[in-house]
Structure formats: structure tokens, C-alpha cells
């Protein structure tokens, strides 16, 4: 089992080391292969998945077997069928890995515990707002962009993500050296 580290998710940056040690047991590490389903329609949904690495898509499949993608989730984003999660109902959506993906998941009960015990409601509210904005932008794109423009927009996001990961992984020394190097430029 992979041990969760404080630098794995932005969520943990706002916590003291003591708080991190207390919150760590609530998160369950799960690894998925490209093509795996994290959530399938008609399943109970009792977890939120925070993406450590990889790429997933959340989609709906209609009665004619047509697939409509609702969202993509990258590193440090979270995803689930939120309606099913919060209403304790069966999923109508599918969450599938487009790449090999690592996640840290939170069970519904644990999600509520950490919201209250660690005062993280503001963090999850901001995540929700960012997700809502991304959904609105996606809907606008669907309504106004050609298939080619939609694909180009997706590629820009993917390229930006890869560049961000390159920068993140570029320097492996102490953080204090990184901050000093940033100031020198």
C-alpha cells in the first residue's frame, strides 16, 4: 500500500504536520489502469476520488449507447457522481480512466468528519466552485465550438498540465532552495 505524503495533494498544504498525521488515515490510495472504471452506472457511490496522477472522464451513456462526457479530471482535481454520492443513490454516470491513474479517495462518512474536524469546508467549497466554473465553460464550449475547436481546447489543457508537471518534477532538492532559486530569477 502506498503511503500518503503531505506533498501529494494541495489539500494538505493548508494543514500543520500534526493535522496531516491525524487526517492521513481517512484517505485510501487506489491505483487504476487506463480503461478501468472507477464508477459504473447503477452502482452505489460512497467515495470521492482526488486524482494524484492520471486523467479520468466522467460521462453519461444514453439508452442508444451514446456517450456524453460531462467532465475530465486531472491531477489534484476531484471527481465522483456527486448526485449519487450526496444523495446515497445509484450512479447514473461512469468514471473511467483515460490514463493510468492514482487516486486518494474519501468515504462519505470520512468526508463529513474531515469537513467538520479539520475545518476544510472552505477548501472543498472552492473545489466545488472551480468544478462548477469548469462545467459552465465546458457547456459553453459544447454549444459554441466546432469539434475541431473542442479538441484543440482539450489539447491546450493537456499540454498545460504536462508543462506544470514538468516544472513540479524538475527540482528535487529542499524547498528552501527552490524558493531562493525562484527569487533569484
Predicted regions and their residues:
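Cyclic-nucleotide recognition modules
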Residues: 69-129
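Phosphate-/nucleic-acid-contacting segments
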Residues: 145-185
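Glycine- and acidic-residue-biased ligand/ion/polar-headgroup-sensing regions
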Residues: 35, 46-59, 64, 75-76
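Cyclic nucleotide-binding regulatory module and flanking cytosolic helices
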Residues: 1-28, 84
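Short, Lys/Arg-enriched anionic-surface-contact patches
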Residues: 80, 137-150
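A residue-level structural signature of the nucleotidyltransferase/glycosyltransferase Rossmann-like core
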Residues: 48, 103-104, 162
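Short phosphate-coordinating micro-motif centered on Lys-Gly-acidic
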Residues: 38-43
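Short, Lys/Arg-enriched N-terminal segment that forms or immediately precedes the first helix
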Residues: 5-7, 131-140
Amino acid at each position: 500500500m502506498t503511503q500518503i505524503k503531505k506533498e501529494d495533494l494541495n489539500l494538505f498544504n493548508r494543514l500543520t504536520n500534526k493535522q496531516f498525521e491525524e487526517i492521513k488515515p481517512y484517505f485510501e490510495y487506489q491505483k487504476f489502469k487506463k480503461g478501468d472504471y472507477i464508477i459504473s452506472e447503477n452502482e452505489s457511490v460512497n467515495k470521492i476520488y482526488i486524482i494524484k496522477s492520471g486523467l479520468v472522464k466522467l460521462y453519461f451513456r444514453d439508452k442508444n449507447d451514446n456517450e456524453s462526457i460531462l467532465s475530465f479530471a486531472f491531477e489534484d482535481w476531484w471527481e465522483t457522481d456527486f448526485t449519487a454520492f450526496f444523495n446515497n443513490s445509484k450512479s447514473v454516470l461512469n468514471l473511467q480512466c483515460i490514463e493510468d491513474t492514482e487516486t486518494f479517495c474519501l468515504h462519505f462518512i470520512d468526508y463529513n468528519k474531515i469537513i467538520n474536524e479539520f475545518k476544510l469546508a472552505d477548501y472543498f467549497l472552492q473545489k466545488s466552485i472551480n468544478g462548477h466554473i469548469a462545467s459552465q465553460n465546458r457547456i459553453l464550449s459544447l454549444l459554441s465550438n466546432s469539434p475541431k475547436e473542442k479538441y484543440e481546447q482539450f489539447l491546450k489543457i493537456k499540454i498545460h498540465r504536462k508543462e506544470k508537471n514538468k516544472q513540479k518534477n524538475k527540482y528535487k532538492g529542499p524547498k528552501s532552495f527552490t524558493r531562493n532559486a525562484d527569487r533569484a530569477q
